C-alpha cells in the first residue's frame, strides 16, 4: 500500500479526469444518462504498467520486511559445565519452530557445538553466520557489539526469528544486557528478550559460599568483587533460572530445600525450572519480554526471600507504598529524589547516612529494578519501571483498580531494606 500511495494522475495515460459524483446532485439523472463506456479497460494499460514498475522499484529499494522486524535476543549465562551448550542444543537444534541464530562467545574444550561451528574470517571482529542446514544459524563472536549483530541480521534477511547469545562462563551479564537494552528511538533491529541463567545444582552452593579461586569446580579463573563471585551477578540478573543436573540432588529433600531458599534469597522474581540435561519446554524461556514490560503478578508475588538462609551480599527486597498523588510527586520526588539517587553512584546510601559513605565500604549497588507505580488523579495511571544497574526506563502500565499499592522490587548487593525504606519515607513525606 505504501507504493500505491505515491501513484499520481497522468492525463496522457489516464485520459480526462472524471468529475466526482456524490449522489446529491439535483441533476443526478441527467448526469447518469450522459455516462458512457467504450468497452476498454477502466485503467489504461500504460497506467497498469507504470504502477507495477513503481511497486517493483519501491519493494527493491525499501527495507525488507524481515529487516524491519525487531529480532529478540536471549542471553544465556552460567559457569562452564553448567549446561549452557546443552540448553542451546535443546532449543536451537531439536525441534524449535523458529529460525534461530546462535551466537557463541565462549571457547571451551567441552563444547562440541563450538568446535563444529566456529569459522574463521580473517581479522574481522565478528565472524559470518554458519548455516546448520536445519533452519538454524550459528556464529562465534569474540568482540560482541550490537552493530556486529545487526550487520549479521541485515545480511541474513528472513533467515532469523530469534537470537541466542551464549556468554563466557565468567562473564557478568549486566553490561551485555545494557548494550542490547536500547531506546526505541535508536531503531535497533534487535532487542533483549531476557537473561537465562543456568546453574549446576550439585555445585552452585559451593560457588556462592566459597570465594577462593581454588575452590571453584569449573576450573575457570573466577572474577571476584569483594566477597562476591560472578555466580552472584549471574543469578541477580536472571529472568529465568535453569536449575540443571537436578538428578544429582533430588535424592535429598533437604538439599533441594536449601538450594531453593538460597537462590530465592538472591533472586526471588525469576521463575525457576529444575531440569535434567537442561531439558525444559521452549515456551518457558523464549518470548518472555522481560525488559519491555512487567507482568503484574511478577511484582505482586515477589519480594525478599523468607527462608532460613540469608546471603546479605546479594539479595532481593520489595518495597510497598501508597499511590503517588500526582505527576509532580512522581517526577520531582519519586524519580528525582528517590529512584535516581538510589541507582546512581550509591547516592542513596550517602543520603540516608547524612552525606557520608558507609564505614565498612559496602555501599549498595542495585543490579535489577522492577516496579509498578500508581499515580492518582482525575485519570489514574500506572507506570512500569525496568532497570539494569544505573540505567532505567519507564513504560505505560495498566491501572485496573485491583492494585492498591505501589510496589518496587530491587535485586542487588548489600541492600539494606530499612535504609532504603527510610529514604523512600523521607522522600514522600
Curated annotation (Swiss-Prot):
Any one of the GO CC terms: cytoplasm
GO MF annotation terms: enzyme activator activity; GTP binding; GTPase activity; metal ion binding; zinc chaperone activity
Motif (CXCC motif): 136-139
Keywords associated with the record: Chaperone, GTP-binding, Hydrolase, Metal-binding, Nucleotide-binding, Zinc
Regions crossing the membrane: none
PANTHER family to which the protein is assigned, alphabetical: COBW-RELATED, ZINC-REGULATED GTPASE METALLOPROTEIN ACTIVATOR 1A-RELATED
Official protein name in the record: Zinc-regulated GTPase metalloprotein activator 1
Amino acid at each position: 500500500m505504501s507504493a500505491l500511495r505515491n501513484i499520481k494522475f497522468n492525463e496522457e495515460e489516464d485520459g480526462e479526469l472524471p468529475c466526482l459524483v456524490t449522489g446529491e446532485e439535483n441533476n443526478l439523472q441527467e448526469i447518469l444518462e450522459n455516462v458512457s463506456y467504450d468497452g476498454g479497460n477502466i485503467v489504461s494499460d500504460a497506467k497498469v504498467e507504470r504502477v507495477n514498475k513503481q511497486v517493483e522499484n519501491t519493494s527493491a529499494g525499501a527495507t525488507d520486511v524481515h529487516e524491519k522486524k525487531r529480532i529478540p535476543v536471549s542471553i544465556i549465562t552460567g559457569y562452564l559445565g553448567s549446561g549452557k551448550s546443552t540448553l542451546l542444543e535443546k532449543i536451537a537444534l531439536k525441534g524449535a519452530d523458529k529460525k534461530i541464530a546462535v551466537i557463541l562467545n565462549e571457547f571451551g574444550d567441552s563444547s562440541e557445538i563450538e568446535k563444529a561451528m566456529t569459522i574463521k574470517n580473517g581479522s574481522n571482529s565478528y565472524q559470518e553466520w554458519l548455516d546448520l542446514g536445519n533452519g538454524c544459524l550459528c556464529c562465534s563472536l569474540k568482540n560482541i557489539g550490537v552493530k556486529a549483530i545487526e550487520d549479521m541480521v541485515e545480511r541474513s534477511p528472513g533467515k532469523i526469528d530469534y537470537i541466542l547469545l551464549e556468554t563466557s562462563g565468567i562473564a557478568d551479564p549486566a553490561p551485555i544486557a545494557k548494550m542490547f537494552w536500547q531506546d526505541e528511538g535508536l531503531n535497533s533491529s534487535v532487542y533483549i528478550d531476557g537473561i537465562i541463567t543456568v546453574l549446576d545444582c550439585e555445585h552452585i552452593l559451593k560457588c556462592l559460599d566459597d570465594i577462593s579461586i581454588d575452590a571453584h569446580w569449573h576450573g575457570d579463573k573466577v572474577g571476584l568483587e569483594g566477597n562476591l563471585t560472578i555466580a552472584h551477578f549471574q543469578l541477580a540478573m536472571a529472568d529465568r533460572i535453569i536449575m540443571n543436573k537436578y538428578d544429582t540432588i533430588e535424592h535429598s529433600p533437604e538439599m533441594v530445600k536449601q538450594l531453593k531458599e538460597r537462590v530465592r534469597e538472591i533472586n526471588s522474581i525469576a521463575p525457576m525450572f529444575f531440569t535434567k540435561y537442561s531439558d525444559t519446554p521452549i515456551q518457558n524461556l523464549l518470548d518472555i519480554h522481560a525488559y519491555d514490560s512487567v507482568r503484574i503478578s511478577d511484582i505482586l508475588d515477589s519480594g525478599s526471600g523468607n527462608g532460613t538462609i540469608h546471603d546479605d551480599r546479594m539479595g532481593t527486597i520489595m518495597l510497598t507504598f501508597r499511590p503517588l498523588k500526582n505527576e509532580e510527586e512522581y517526577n520531582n520526588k519519586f524519580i528525582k529524589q528517590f529512584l535516581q539517587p538510589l541507582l546512581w553512584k550509591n547516592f542513596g546510601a550517602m543520603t540516608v547516612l547524612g552525606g557520608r559513605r558507609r564505614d565498612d565500604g559496602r555501599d549498595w549497588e542495585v543490579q535489577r529494578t522492577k516496579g509498578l507505580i500508581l499515580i492518582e488523579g482525575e485519570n489514574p495511571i500506572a507506570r512500569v519501571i525496568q532497570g539494569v544497574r544505573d540505567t532505567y526506563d519507564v513504560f505505560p502500565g495498566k491501572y485496573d483498580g485491583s492494585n492498591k499499592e505501589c510496589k518496587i522490587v530491587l535485586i542487588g548487593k548489600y541492600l539494606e531494606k530499612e535504609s532504603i525504606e527510610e529514604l523512600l519515607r523521607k522522600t514522600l513525606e
